[in-house]
Amino acid sequence: MPSKKTDAPKQSEAAGTQTPDRANTNAKLQSLETFRSDATGQALRTNQGVKIADNQNSLKAGARGPSLLEDFIMREKITHFDHERIPERIVHARGTGAHGYFQSYGNHADLTKAGFLQDPDKITPVFVRFSTVQGPRGSGDTVRDVRGFAVKFYTDEGNFDLVGNNMPVFFIQDAIKFPDFVHAVKPEPHNEIPTGGSAHDTFWDFVSLVPESAHMVMWAMSDRAIPRSLRMMEGFGVHTFRLINAEGVASFVKFHWKPRQGVHSLLWDEAQKLAGKDTDFQRRDLWEAIENGDYPEWELGVQIVPEADEHKFDFDLLDPTKIIPEELVPVTPLGKMVLNRNPDNFFAEVEQVAFCPGHIVPGIDFTNDPLLQGRLFSYTDTQISRLGGPNFHQIPINRPVAPNHNNQRDALHQHVVHKGRASYEPNSIDGGWPKETPAAAQDGGFESYQERIDAHKIRQRSESFGDHFSQARLFFQSMSPTEQQHIIKAYSFELGKVEREHIRAREVNEILANIDLKLAAAVAANLGLPAPKAGTVQVKGSQLAQSPALSQMNHPGSVGIKGRKIAVLVANGVDAASVDKLIKALEAHSARPMLLGPTSAPVKATDGKQLPVEASMEGMPSIMFDGIVVPSGKASTDALAASGLAKHFLLEGYKHLKAMVLTKELATGLGLKEDKGLLLADDQKAVDAFVKAVEGHRVWEREAAAEAVPA
């Protein structure tokens, strides 16, 4: 039975050494050991190593006299405190991260000479940072936004950073427009509102004037923008990259991360409530999953396009606002990534980690995607100001496990004591070291792909980038009816927040009407605007009418209800046998049942024993759970039926389409009818049906009935 920790720790918990994930290690984690610090059993000292006798009082002239400037202990402490904060990331400021490893499924030497993709026995350390885009460090986790999905591979050949998102496209095609887009989506400059959202005039003014954003905005208005968990979202490299094998043969590829937990989202009402009830909902979910041993896992795959097939599609592979539909080019699995250890210190690891798309290794190379080309500059440039200079690669979390010797010297925060007299190349003084490494099939120096280029310098967008609506239409028409309704409601909500009617009308008439007239008409009706009769441009036909891979409904996952949080509501008089039976049944499926009571105090079961609860129903409301069960016990269910808090908990769970196990009397009292996910018993048959309903994430068939519930 779950219980709270009540004893004070005998050892320091600063490093979290008591949790199972701390036993997991790899080459990168071992290298970080040099920099870890645990103060257990140590004297309090100044930064200069002087022991401190009194850390409670500043040095004064008499007990009530003036403080003295000579108090070097106070001055050091206050000065350091005054400078603890560093500039936050311009975008993706709000984030969290974890350590883990990548393991290739086999030898992919036919595709690339990158060493970490050639040995199935090789464990490559990784560090992953997930983030939102718009909001500052203190913004909410559950806002409607793109999620960053950045992975740093610490390979034997150097660091490889795959800096992607949970959506496979972006808002713009050329990096020169990135400052304009970010200025538009960020809080408006006159009042710094809104925080963490795009439902405001400047964003919709920009995207309604920039049709290339139409496809990405469709993704942002879908359920993909409000993931249930960071563990339950896909990741994408966004751009087309090249993989090159030892023979110099290149292939175009798109990178994909497929979560074993499936692709699942919050409901919009849940997302808004969670932003207030638990701002840290998603980072807490990731932390607790790893701490409990429910290690998140993704499969890395690539869509492979031979160079000879570059132009066989009705879109341009270099256009970052386009996908390659998986029905045209299936995803080839390469390996798996497992996140199995939480950071020891958030600032040192998550805040100071520096990703850059330009961090690649032999066997991987860029393409001429104009957004990617700008990112190659921007990421390094921003780290220099954010992390205090060009030596940010020496920060422990950023250091490669591969050795790095070169002639880059000095600058702010230099940590390396370089030996020798020659800091240039070639030299004869230090034996010519360090020396270049010729390119080779294995363990060679990096060699850029020898792409032939014959062109005039010109500021012009390729005509092949000109179709802005066919893939947005493909996305919408690939959604289930439920997902389509969520998109309609999202557009209506966001545009309903826009103050200027001409912006709302322009988005409906010049963007949505070119995607789908039914979509445009539905949004127009919700905004009180006339429905457009036709689009404003001739939209190209797509090679596909639908792409089933785009619908989340087709990505249920492969781990059942492992790691899913189930609320078990109890009050005094609960049947102990029923509780025990339900807990054991859920734990058998590796779910995480949690006992919740009217308060945080233990409840008395029918056998006379005190049952400890993990939280109160007020402290952990229904929006934090994937399912709800109520054990039998008349006194307990009567108490819940009489509690406004419990009734709200249950009605809200029903409204949010959660799977539920209730007594018949309790359901009748709440006015709820049995359905595929509302079971009116606690026997094994009901538990089995409950598990199946939780696997489906929501009881979608209930959505129409749930609209009438006022929770």
Swiss-Prot record:
Look up and give the organism this protein is from. Pseudomonas putida (Arthrobacter siderocapsulatus)
Highest rank taxon of the organism: Bacteria
Task: List the protein's name.
Answer: Catalase HPII
InterPro entries documented for this protein: Catalase, Catalase_AS, Catalase_clade2, Catalase_clade2_helical, Catalase_core, Catalase_haem_BS, Catalase_immune_responsive, Catalase_large_C
Q: Do you know which NCBIfam families this protein is assigned to?
A: PRK11249.1 (NF008422)
The catalytic site is made up of 92, 165
The keyword Protein transport belongs to this UniProt entry's keyword annotation: no
Q: Does the keyword Aminoacyl-tRNA synthetase apply?
A: no
Region: Disordered; residue ranges are 1-27
| Sorted UniProt keywords | Cytoplasm, Heme, Hydrogen peroxide, Iron, Metal-binding, Oxidoreductase, Peroxidase
